[in-house]
Amino acid sequence: MESMKQLKNHNVDLISNNDPLDKNRLLIEDLWESVLREECPNDQANRLMKLKELSYCNQVEEDISRTFKNEIVDIVNSMDLAESISAARAFSLYFQLVNILEQRVEEDRYIQSFTNKNNQKSHDNLDPFAPALARQNAPVTFRELFYRLRKLNVPPGKLEELLQEMDIRLVFTAHPTEIVRHTIRHKQTRVANLLQKIQVEKFLTVEDIKSLKIQLKEEIRLWWRTDELHQFKPSVIDEVDYALHYFQQVLFNAMPQLRGRISSALTENYPDVQMPTESFCTFGSWVGSDRDGNPSVTPEITWRTACYQRKLMLERYISATSNLRDQLSVSMQWSQVSSSLLESLETDRVQFPEIYEARATRYRSEPYRLKLSYILEKLRLTKERNNLLAEAGWKFSLERESDNKNIELVEKLHYRSVDEFTYDLELIKNSLNSTDLTCEAVSKLLTQVHIFGFSLASLDIRQESTRHSDAIQELTNYLELPKKYDQMPEIERIEWLKDELNTKRPLIPAEVSWTKSTEETFSVFKMVKRLQEEFGSRICHSYVISMSHSASDLLEVLLLAKEMGLIDQSSQKSKLLVVPLFETVEDLKRAPEVMEQLFQLDFYRSLLPKVGERFKPIQELMLGYSDSNKDSGFLSSNWEIHRAQIALQNLSSKNNILLRLFHGRGGSVGRGGGPAYQAILAQPSGTLKGRIKITEQGEVLASKYSLPELALYNLETVTTAVIQNSLVINRLDATPEWNDLMTRLAETSRIQYRKLVHENPNLLTFFQEVTPIEEISKLQISSRPARRKKGAKDLSSLRAIPWVFGWTQSRFLLPSWFGVGTALSVELKSDPEQIELLRVLHQRWPFFRMLISKVEMTLSKVDLEVAKYYVDTLGSKENAKSFGDIFDVISKEYNLTKSLVLEITGKNKLLESDRDLRLSVNLRNKTIIPLGFLQVSLLRRLRDQTRQPPISEFLNERNESERAYSRSELLRGALLTINGIAAGMRNTG
């Protein structure tokens, strides 16, 4: 067997000394090996290196060598429990280091794109529209995009109109939760920063480089001695803290930079075009407000989340204002000051005499510093008041409690709204401008205030539709309606709900004891009203109804909102935007009919918020990728979502209503994930119009927002794609022949998928036995249960996230591709000439190209050799025949799909046209093999113990204690392999 160094040399065709990724990968691997040799016993370290060498052998060979695979299995099976855990930790560490390295390289390449400012000629032939659009794989910068638009003679007025209407909303979610501990994330950031310093080695001395490598090794050794697993199940507030970390550390400062890059690109290419508003891109969050299937998210938790968000923003503003006070040392002896600012100082002196006494002498000739001292005091008081409210809870109001011992704090002048804070900052900015001075820090802070306000991110409430209908059912039972609500057909329900919405009479009687579920449903609406009273409507104005099936689902929420004071009947205005979430394929097909029923109701239209210069009503509508995929498979899900968007946009236009589509995309392809740029470009032409809302799932937050330039890259990618798609007149989506073909493909794919997943009685048992789904549920990574209903074991109760997670761990990745091959094959059997049409679609239609690209990428990660090992080793003997049949179906579909995808793309290998991605996937595919075999070994031992009779029948008390500890450690080892494979595959669910 060759040594690792010899194997690295044998792999020279894949490594370029000039490629920073390859160069630094060798550095990372050397450090990884060095740390393991220092931290592990010598024979154990040798076996780990042997596993790594065998992985390299597999990487060099085109196909997995059975000899090498058997050697890996032999080594894994020879390991005792402690060594297995060390091996799982070692390979998990390796993949996390590789992930850091790839992120750093992505960040550097993005930065380099700004240094190639004069290389415009290379872009001249790249047409962002029509057929050439589909051939663009790499995202573009603002500068590149505006340059191309100018070359294509896109009128400045058309671009400006779009920019002024642009409304991009990115919504952070907790689930699927990031599997890596927050503690480990901090270590990863430090490693990334050290790598960044090493990468500029041409500016460093030999001693500097040596010192940095020593620091890097020290950090990795500390990491090795840190527990990777969460020690406790995170609370919802823990999840809130995790998500808000990215706002604190990265996004707060990144957003003004994003705006600056747009400004620079416009000045260069469209100097007369007005900038978009500061809030063209804002943020939302479901963390702490998404209560669908999560009983831990209570009204109190949502209230605490809002207070926590405001606390973080106030702390950032206090810090920024303090820095401004240090900077703005302008003296009245050398500069004029606006009369408005001087008048405000006089008002502040009266309202804050203690600040005047403390600061007036020091700042008697420095008005900006004095003004900022008053601002700091107001911010401090606002923060103290916020802390009191967080402790008191949502049912408590400081203003209403006259006996509150801290009432004197309220009587002082805190900021009652972010507008008051903005006004004070504008006074400073305008005064500086009036004397021909500017201050970038003031402008930056104002931009941050416009984007984040005091609330940081809007909290979307989400709840499942039956919770509302159950509450109204209980209410109407109490009221003794002539006909029970649940017995009314849909038309009757709509009429009854409409009548109740139009009456001023209260429906819900006071002082009635409701069931716990109904009482909490009512309390959510009461809490939202209190939130808006305290924070303003910005904090919480969207209510997402998951599993929306009918018009009554939306009207029920509106009725509850009306009863809790969230609808002003006199003005016909609602303080809550009701957002249906259509998730299953059948619901997606029915969505246009449901919305048309609602749009025909005058009172419903009047309740829609009005936006834009034309003051038109807007409807937000969410499309679910996860459950539609789990329901009908990848191809059917994507096509029905595509068709629904077109139908809904046509319906909205007909009714003179604006549409904002909310895409519930996950991190994995099986849940709508994939490159954001290609996904947005593939949206049907005419459906965006500058407006889009997208979920940013917990598992992808680190890969997108952990580093400043990565965050800017992602934000710029999304924005340029929205601009590009919105300005495209792409008539390819309306090609009848293409639509008919896609409809046939989607239906055939759906039938094949459902035949395996929903109609095969052995599939659920197969999934439970040959994937680590049960062990995944024991990972302490999420506050939300893996199943919608407690105790349920059926497929319908299993959430889409663990469904995808389980298939990914066992290397099937089935939800992301199964059924595609059969659909293509059936079409080509009926007409072999269709292959040419499919190739045309791949070349010219962004939607179809995106589909094939996602399938191709997913297929490249599938490893049926490893998957078969899961089946053979973990499957029970009594199910061997049925499991073998299922595997044969999956294997046949995989080979069929792979061959037809290659036939459509015209390539010989998967990912042949994307070298960087191919090398990354190949590296991971081979190096992850030992982890898969380790996982199987640990799962087998764990499950064997679990299946044995009660231990007390055979062992004394002492041995029982040892046996229990061993079972716990086996689970720990299995969970560590789950961590490692998730890092290697770069996603969970």
From Swiss-Prot:
SUPFAM superfamilies: Phosphoenolpyruvate/pyruvate domain. GO terms for biological process: carbon fixation; oxaloacetate metabolic process; tricarboxylic acid cycle. It is an enzyme of class 4 (lyase). It catalyses: oxaloacetate + phosphate = phosphoenolpyruvate + hydrogencarbonate. Pfam families: PEPcase. Its cofactor is Mg(2+). InterPro entries: PEP_COase, PEP_COase_bac/pln-type, PEP_COase_Lys_AS, PEPCASE_His_AS, Pyrv/PenolPyrv_kinase-like_dom. The active site is at H175, K630. Signal peptide: none annotated. Gene3D superfamilies: Phosphoenolpyruvate/pyruvate domain. GO terms for cellular component: cytosol. It comes from the Bacteria. Keywords: Carbon dioxide fixation, Lyase, Magnesium. GO terms for molecular function: magnesium ion binding; phosphoenolpyruvate carboxylase activity. The keyword Magnesium applies. The keyword Lyase applies. Forms oxaloacetate, a four-carbon dicarboxylic acid source for the tricarboxylic acid cycle. This is Phosphoenolpyruvate carboxylase. The gene is ppc.
